[in-house]
Amino acid sequence: MCNCSKGKYYITTPIYYPSGNPHIGHCYTTVACDTIARFKRMQGYDVMFLTGTDEHGQKIELKAEEKGVTPKEYVDEIVANFKRLWETMGISYDRFIRTTDDYHVSAVQKIFKTLYDKGYIYKGEYTGKYCTPCESFWTESQLVNGKCPDCGRDVIDAHEEAYFLRLSDYADKVEKFLTETDYLQPKSRVNEMVNNFIKPGLEDLCVSRTSFKWGVPVDFDPGHVVYVWVDALSNYITALGYDNDKYDDFSKYWPADLHMTAKEIVRFHSIVWPIILMMLDLPLPKHLYGHGWINFNGQKMSKSLGNVIDPFVLAERYGSDAVRYQIPRDMPYGSDCNFSNEIMIGRIHTDLANDLGNLVSRTVAMADKYFGGTLPEEKKAEPIDDELRTMAAALAEPVSKLIEEAQLSKALEEIFKVVSRANKYIDETAPWVLAKSEENMPRLAAVLYNLLESIRICSGLLFPFMPKTMPKVWEQIGADESMTAYDTLGTFGVLPQNVTVHKGEVLFPRIDMEKEIDELNSLLTPAKTIREDEDLDKANVITIDQFAEVKLRSGEITACEKIKKAKKLLKLTVDDGRNGRQIVSGIANWYQPEDLIGRKIVFVANLAPAKLCGELSEGMILACDAGDNDVRVLFLDKDVPNGSTIR
């Protein structure tokens, strides 16, 4: 229980647009925020964790019309699914806001009127392009191949009377805010915002619409509704009671300590939102973290591609904690991550079942077998103990810093270094050999105590990531609530010397990887292949900047072998013109190892490393679906130098 001795901490997800049911992409942001919120509570902060739904806009109005229901009826059903998912995933939000809530609607009307009265909002005519799915206005010059630069979809002509927000008046101030503070993270996003949106000339923002009705009415000008972004962004303060009497803790929690959002809406949170707050003379939030996208098998998740992952399926099959672990584990700081069924199963099998689960079960089982569950007071230390004890005792500090910086993948990496070292320590000390001699029992007790203490520290730091599983670990290793408090996690030796363990259920059952991947493939919709008669222009379009993020290189396969545990996978050693790398590829059904050695291939060089069937994979080779269940690798000419950039 938090004693709230450290002050306040206010963290927010974006509020999600309920035009369709939630998917794994929504889970990342919410799980990440929940992890940080839980960690800050452990540290003693009074945490306010806000999430919710952004329910207005033309897209919702059109979707409801298609279904023959009112917009409110349409969003009510989907919002219920969001809340059900957050309950399934163990999300500990403190407040859930809906932009259709009466208190929020009235507060937005007051905010809009205040900005108008101050002269920051003026009436004019809007002529340009509009993307309905993104709820975004664009000029002709901002389009990419005539499409929305954010989502690649078609835009429509828009011409209507509208109110505008004078963003242009604040261009210099918001640029200074972005460049002279650490508000926007990672720092690479600052250059994107300044160079792409501010320096070319920050244009005033259209903040009302007359062509649809589903929105917050502009109460002093009937026919206008407040444009969705002013409505949505204001949730961060209205949910605390700003300009309403629903809540009264605005002065307590504002400014926000961390806004977290996906990169496609960073510009609204880094430019529009600070400007609105400046206009209202309100303090600016402290930090904004714009994370990358979750791609499925290398493609951005999209309902039109049929590759949206249902998190309910994953949570039901593997438990919510396994999903909570895998998503942040494979999301590099600020970059996109690649999700695949193989990666998901690999993490559960290798990290959770083999490494963590096996460490706990082996240690508890040995304590139970050799000492009846209770360790003796007498112990004998040896120098070989020092490295594990030192690593475990020093773990909390770097992990805390990384979580504070939203670098969750690196935080987990640090924790699992100690888990790995503890497993190695078992092999080094061989408790089963020590148990054969009565005179070695004090030494055996010391070994098992060191393992239990290492598990205590690791599980304490893992609790924010896996809040349902770690209490089960504590019960098995004999740790009560006081022994897993944050302040104890930097100290080695907190468990009583005569600690009693309790054998329990298997935390993460072992998985038949090949069988499980096949079953998961049948449960989760695979990516849709574009047929010859389909319009390629209507496929999921990306911008040139997005494409530039994918680094394609040439390489030569110098060695290749099958992986015993997986019939579909080959382990490739690739000369990439630098230090070489290992890539695991699911092409064993179509190629023999000897067919590939010496061949030149194209591979993705900046894909986050992942373990597949226990083997490190540092990239992805390019191959083509040739139809009729046939896959062909893309080979290059022999004279292409290894490591060449593919353009």
Where are these regions (language model features)?
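N-terminal catalytic cores of NTP/NDP-binding nucleotidyl/phosphoryl-transfer enzymes
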Residues: 2-78, 97-112, 117, 134, ...
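Structured secondary-structure scaffolds
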Residues: 2-51, 103-107, 157-369, 411-415
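A glycine-rich helix N-cap at a beta->alpha junction
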Residues: 80-92
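Short secondary-structure capping/junction motifs at helix and strand boundaries
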Residues: 89-98, 116-129, 141-142, 156-158, ...
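Cys/His-rich short segments
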Residues: 118-171, 175
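Helix-rich, typically C-terminal accessory recognition domains appended to large enzymatic cores
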Residues: 123, 330, 335-338, 343-381, ...
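Intrinsic disorder at enzyme termini
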Residues: 473-546
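Phosphate-backbone binding interfaces of nucleic-acid-interacting proteins
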Residues: 528-647
